[in-house]
Amino acid sequence: MKKHLYSIIVGLGLSSVPVIAQQAVQPCITYHAMEEHFKADTQAKTRYEAAQKQLEQETIQNSMSNARPVAFQYTVPVVFHVLHQGGAENISDATITAALAQINSDYARAGSDVTSIAQPFQNLYINSDIKFMLAHKDPNGNCTTGIEHLYDTRTVWQQANTSYYNGITWNPTKYLNVIIVSQIVPSGTVAGGGTIVGYTYKPGTWSTGASQDAIVYNFGYLNSLYNMRSLSHEIGHWLNLSHTFGNTNNPGVACGDDQLYDTPPTKGNYGSCGSSSSGNSCAASSTSVYTAGQQNVENIMDYSSCPKNFTTDQTNAMRTALASSVNNRQNLWSATNLTATDVNGTSPCAPIADFYAANSALTSYTVCEGGSITFKDFSYNGTISSYNWSAGGGANIASPSASVTSITFPTAGATTVALTVGNSTGSNTKVRNVYVMNAVPGITGPTNESFENQGVPSGWSVINPNSNSAAWDQTFDVVCYDGFGAFFIEGSKCATGQIDYLETPIIDVANNQDQSFSFALSYAQKSSTQNDVLKVQGSKDCGGTWNEIA
């Protein structure tokens, strides 16, 4: 009789994830993110206000002097970091290049819908001479397409955890970083609620060179003209534009202004495209630019359903941000940086190899002796013309030259799997570790573990995917019903979304079907907003897949 062998894994995941009303769409949470940062860093607000004062003065000076060289162009190197777990969020390079083309059209006043913009805003919409180009050299001088595809759990992006940027963004004084994710989870409650499209930080919010000087954007909003313009909107914030209805993420509530002369004060619009010619009670008086009652509904920095334009003063403000020392935006378009980032590069790159199990987001794998794992290619950075899979321990590879293959592991022990991908430019190899388990139960009958002996018990495992200081650890500083030993996690050290595992030996339940599994638990919630979770899971395939059992 074949026995089903189970291993129980106990994981405590610490997170602070609010409930979001999915039926609504929140185009932007830039000001929410900024306010959260100001609360966390008492010096940030002072730094930001000083930067804004500098930019305000520089904008006025540039507007008065109108000294911009004829036919001058601000070229900004861009890199997209696509974070994914193998799903639809792993958008294609073609989708990104199409979105970038639309952004450049918006900033060049080159859209096919320009003639439909209401006056006087059609005439106020000018070519910004700002162009965004994919970088072709990374910070180390290596060839890049300017689009990274990174298999990363941070694709479910926690806005509250500003450490998420670490290891993703490239030097923001040399690149505009756009991080594409599957979902943005805001901290606390955001006015308007709903699905978050994107956010960034205006110049001066973070210190120069900070990894957080980037745009975070939902992958689902790059699939149509007006959705793409939401990214043009976020770039506008990154270039120091405010919402036309003021420094808030909640339009339609109160009259607001962006402090620019040629954009009428407005309550703002959400999800509709009202009249630009009348009905704006916030613009009670005529000016030399617009008449009383007018509003620029079609402004890209509004929340309307018909974004089409920037104004002349908005364009001047964005040019000023790029010419300023604030966050060293002036370095982005310098000749030295354009050479270093190789924005005009055309040479193809060798691909960068990457692969994962088709049904797992783990970077290390466990399988029963004689079992198999299906691996899937997630390489990027170049067109791939060849695949070559290899594995140790006498493993059998079903399709060694395909992008997806099943590999069977006949012998217990540690081994490796490697994928080499290549094209005419070069090749690259990725190696991952696999542990093949001898599926012999470590627990064959009734047992008890009180953790009274020093160290992790024989056959048990502590798994800390984040490799940080917050992990399952032993303590003897508690009074339990059967002694003083226990395993615990110091929750104050856990980052949002962190998961840690405590794994038992293999338990033979096939011959012990009348047995039960129980454990003693002590837990206290630090605050009502914390959503810590304890889950008990079991696996029938030596850790290949897991199902919740309690």
Show where each model-derived region lies:
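Primarily auto-inhibitory N-terminal propeptides
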Residues: 22-110
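Extracellular (secreted or membrane-anchored) zinc-dependent metallopeptidases
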Residues: 70-72, 78-88, 93-138, 148-354
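A short beta-strand segment in extracellular, disulfide-stabilized domains
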Residues: 366-379
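Surface-exposed, flexible coil segments in extracellular/virion-facing regions
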Residues: 384-408
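Exoplasmic/lumenal beta-rich domain surfaces
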Residues: 397, 541-550
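Extracellular glycan-recognition surfaces and repeat-rich motifs
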Residues: 444-498, 550
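Short beta-strands within extracellular/lumenal beta-sheet-rich domains
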Residues: 494-511
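Extended, low-complexity, turn-rich repeat/linker tracts enriched in Gly/Pro/Ser/Thr and Asp/Glu
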Residues: 510-513, 523-531
